[in-house]
Amino acid sequence: VLRILTDSSRFRFRSVGVELEPERHRVQGLREYALLRTNVANVIDDGETSPEYSPFAWIDFSEYDSWEAVNKWAAELYSGLGMDSEKVVALARKLRRQSSSDADYITRALFFVQNEIRYLGLELGENSHRPREPREVLNKRYGDCKDKSLLLATLLRQQGIRAWPALVSTNSRYGVERGLPSPGAFDHVITMVEFKGKSYWLDGTRLYQAGGLDDLGFSDYGFALVVGHGNASLQRMYPEPPLASRVDITEEIIASDFNEPVILKVKTEYHRNAAEVQRFQFQNMSLESIKRNFLEYYGRFYSDISAVGVPAYKDDIRRNRFTVSETYRIDNYWKQKDSLIYNKIYNLSYLETLKKPQVRQRTTPYYLGAPRKITSVLHLRYPRNVILKLDENPVSIENPTLRYVYQDQYSDGVYTHTSSLSLKQKDVALGDMRSYLDSLDEIRKDWEYTLTVANPDVVPGYSELLDLKARLKVLSGGYHE
């Protein structure tokens, strides 16, 4: 049972996920809206869904008849605040002197707001929606998302750069358009910047950001209401799913002898959101703790692995690239049986990205996370040249959700496996679930497999055969089996 009393003649009502119409009555000069539902069926939540999807029915009500009306309400709260403040003007001049270009000015202003203005929300009374004056925020050196957004927009406007506060929903995201227009649809404020024909969505509350405008990490909140912008309705932040992260992994397994341990070297380069995650981790955890976590992860696959030193890292803040280098020793890597030597190859780069949902027979799309790309190159350096028979043709597995490509190659004692994964969208649509699961089964075959070669010390004539192949390769100008 739900009962609403209001004196507003503009009250609007909407039900989502269920056909429902309230009873309307007059009660002591007020309008009454009454809802009653009986024998409501149980709802089972699939889980693992993106924020805008919900299996539950809900109702929405508002006194606003359009998003333009909400924008007008917000514009009145944000207008006329602090453009000519002496402190704001002085700060803008300082940033301008430090900047090599307008693009550099934008990121310097952003990093100032992020790192020099402490995040603190005192959302009481009118300050639950009205931002504080930029000069007040500069004086006190703290502010919430509204305060930071307006300060950043004000600093950018001082440089003649078009910028506006933008209301977004971190909870509903793309689902905000399903509800009625209302200020209550939003719970966060960021800054929209129009620069050189592109729209940038900057968040003054984020930390650990670095790089230029096109290197920054970001969150796709789906739709935004840009306060005071010429387009006063909801705007889709990114018309096409943007690539939120990229991770490039290079692994090298170095063997000195088939009877000796191998050295595993791993170099991982993180971009955009992924770089910010690593920057946070390495600034807030000890290297020993990170080393222990990494070692526990690899220990799930290599039982005789030990770390050689602690992970090393390089933070390229100019390009927002964070590189981590690790070194391990693996004992008992090679297995021998009769005249054969074999070893396991683990392609671990994608384990945390591609998973099967806990509920396969779903009623809602399966959420994978923001679109991203991962590349992996693995080199296995044998202790001597071997004969390794491979299918060296590239293999591509693709469906509406993802694209996975891999290839095997061997040359001069080095086995190389290259692979890449592109997540094209954040959700697996219901109609694509079967193809996603089938593709994942096929892809997982590339994550663990065995390489087998003849033991050069046991097989008669093996070394002579390798010498002959090498001479033929030279004579043929690069013959390669």
Task: Locate predicted features.
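A sensor for short, sequence-defined functional sites
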Residues: V1-E481
